[in-house]
Each structure stands twice: as structure tokens, then as C-alpha cells.
Design a protein with these regions (language model features):
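Cleavable N-terminal export/targeting peptides
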Residues: 1-31
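Subset of outer-membrane beta-barrel
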Residues: 19-342
């Protein structure tokens, strides 16, 4: 049975790699809504080039692969904040706890917001005196459970909402994932499907207007109230499949690699590569490279550090992480995250 699972996984991975050579003429970029759902959550995952589907094991697993939540013990809290691209702010927070005999549950919040800007019109290009902003938000509940010593499953359900000024839209989405520790020592396989849900469209009082239904005919009705209708767009569906494992696995030194193949519905297929070195189970050095094989990719090298330290000689730990990721012409993104394990 295990050999069949491994063979099937290798077949799926090989098929994903083959897609890198096919269907490269149409990328479908810009054809989905709620693009913030693709922003990598967690300093560790971002530092490792977003190669995390097989090796995730902390609260950010609710983003990468909810099956990874099954590795959590006790109670954990995680938060991160960073200035994202083009002056926007990105925030992610999560709370999780292990329910013995049932599974691990988590609640997560993701927010992407823009600063205030002037409302401009054709008649008033310098501003009307009003200001607007935009905000994307996702609230999700996740569960992960180990079915055996080797196989873990997980799922998430989340409410996805987008707003710009007085117009907004929302929908529901689900994520599912699996992780499998192979009989091959220190090798883990993982796969997940993220953002499977209904299409999303915007509506609100910004869409309201008054029009003359027949401007060429003078009559008693000069203007009637009308409403713009916006098209509905699909969510950014992601299929990830990956492999990870320990190159070195000793008491005081651990070197971990990760490779993910990603098939999105709004871009070309690509690979993510990541590497992590952990010293004394306290200090980590990370590096990664995302977007390999993606045409016109702007992502570059990402680097990161992590510190996991006991609190006052107890089993509780404090986790502090830092990541610097290169986004080419859009600049460098720096991220700091903080976690507590009880």
C-alpha cells in the first residue's frame, strides 16, 4: 500500500513538472479575485522560497497545508506584520490548540490593507476632498489530524472578503491537504488544494448612479436610479505538491530541504526551492528561491533567520523570525513574526 502511495505521488509530481513545458502561451494573469490569498504567510515559509507544503508544522500550516497542523502540541499563538508591496500592509495572526484524541484546531486572520488616497474624478482630477482605501480580509477555521504515525489530513473553511471604499464582496472557500512520512528515512510528501470556492464580485453604493434612459427624447422622466453590475471572478485556486526531508539530522545540527511544484489557475506552473539549517534546535538559517519556471517572474532570493528559545527554563517557547525577500523591481520585503508555544 505504501509503495502504491509513493508511486502515485511521484506520478503526480512528475506530471506537474511536465506542465512546466506545456501551455506556456496563456498565463491567465489578472483573471482572479482576492489575489491576497496567494501572499505567503509565515516568515519561515517566505524565507524558504514558499516551498512549505510538505514540511509545514506550525500555525501557518493553515495557509500552506492544514495537514501540518497535526504536528502542533499544546497551545500556540502566532502573529506577523510587514509592509507589503506598493505601500500596502500585510497582517497575519493565528491561534491554535491540540484537542487530545480529536485533532488540532486553529483560527486565523489575514488582512491586506492600503493607505488612504484621494478620491479623484474626471471633473476633479486633483481630488474631491474625500479619501478612500481598500482592504482584503480572510477569517478561517482549520483542523489537522494524524490518522496514523505516517499519514496526516487537514482542512480549512474561510470567509473571503474584499472591499474598496463603499463597495465590497465576499464568498466562502475551503482548503484541503495531506502529508505523508514515507518509509524512506526523513522524507516527507505533501499536497494541498487551496482557495476552492465560489466566484466573487463587488457591490455597494459606489455602483449607484442616476441616468436619463432616453436622452434623445424629452419627457417627464429625466433621470432614474440605476446600478452598475460587476463581473464575478474566480478565486486564485492553487494546487501544490511537494517533497521535503533532512539532508543532515543530528542532535545539534539539522539541514532540511523542500521542493514544491505549484499549479495556479491564474499563472504559469512553477517550482519553489527552500533550505533550512537548524543549530541546537534553537537557531535557524533559511534560504529559498520561488517562481522557478514561471515566465516573467519577478521573485528572487529570499533569506531568513529564526530563534526558538525557552521561556524562563520552562517547556514554553518564544519564536522570533525575520525574512528578507527580493521582489525585483518592486523592492525588498522584510517580515518579522512572533510566536508563543505553551
Amino acid at each position: 500500500m505504501m509503495k502504491r502511495i509513493i508511486a502515485l505521488f511521484i506520478f503526480v509530481l512528475s506530471f506537474s513538472m511536465a506542465q512546466l513545458e506545456n501551455d506556456q502561451d496563456i498565463s491567465k494573469v489578472g483573471t482572479t479575485a482576492a489575489h491576497f490569498l496567494k501572499i505567503s504567510s509565515g516568515s519561515r515559509g517566505l524565507a524558504m522560497g514558499s516551498a512549505n507544503v510538505a514540511i509545514c508544522s506550525d500555525l501557518t500550516s493553515s495557509f500552506w497545508n492544514p495537514a501540518g497542523l497535526s504536528h502542533l502540541k499544546g497551545i500556540q499563538v502566532y502573529f506577523e506584520n510587514n509592509g507589503w508591496l506598493a505601500g500596502t500592509d500585510y497582517n497575519y495572526g493565528s491561534f491554535g490548540f491540540a484537542w487530545p484524541g480529536v485533532g488540532v484546531f486553529s483560527l486565523s486572520l489575514t488582512m491586506l490593507s492600503s493607505p488612504d488616497d484621494l478620491v479623484r474624478t474626471v471633473e476633479q482630477p486633483n481630488g474631491t476632498g474625500e479619501k478612500f482605501n481598500a482592504q482584503d480580509m480572510s477569517i478561517g477555521i482549520s483542523v489537522g489530524k494524524s490518522l496514523t504515525d505516517q499519514l496526516s489530513l487537514g482542512a480549512s473553511i474561510k470567509n473571503v472578503r474584499q472591499r474598496i471604499w463603499h463597495s465590497s464582496g465576499q464568498t466562502l472557500a475551503i482548503d484541503i491537504g495531506v502529508q505523508y512520512e514515507t518509509p524512506i528515512k526523513d522524507i516527507i510528501l505533501g499536497a494541498s488544494i487551496a482557495n476552492f470556492g465560489n466566484d466573487l464580485s463587488l457591490a455597494g453604493r459606489d455602483m449607484s448612479l442616476s441616468v436619463d434612459p432616453d436622452p434623445n427624447n424629452q419627457g417627464n422622466i429625466e433621470f432614474v436610479n440605476a446600478q452598475y453590475e460587476t463581473d464575478a471572478f474566480p478565486l486564485p485556486l492553487l494546487f501544490r505538491v511537494g517533497i521535503g526531508g533532512h539532508i543532515i539530522n543530528k542532535e545539534n545540527l539539522n539541514v532540511l530541504f523542500a521542493i514544491d511544484a505549484v499549479h495556479p489557475n491564474d499563472n504559469y506552473e512553477y517550482l519553489n526551492l527552500g533550505l533550512e539549517t537548524n543549530i541546537n534546535k534553537i537557531f535557524s538559517i533559511r534560504a529559498g528561491y520561488p517562481g522557478i519556471g514561471k515566465k516573467d517572474a519577478i521573485e528572487g532570493l529570499s533569506l531568513g533567520l529564526g530563534l526558538k528559545y525557552p521561556i524562563m527554563n520552562t517547556s514554553n517557547t518564544l519564536v522570533v523570525e525575520y525574512t528578507s525577500a527580493d521582489f525585483g523591481p518592486l523592492g525588498i520585503v522584510q517580515r518579522v513574526s512572533l510566536g508563543f508555544n505553551y
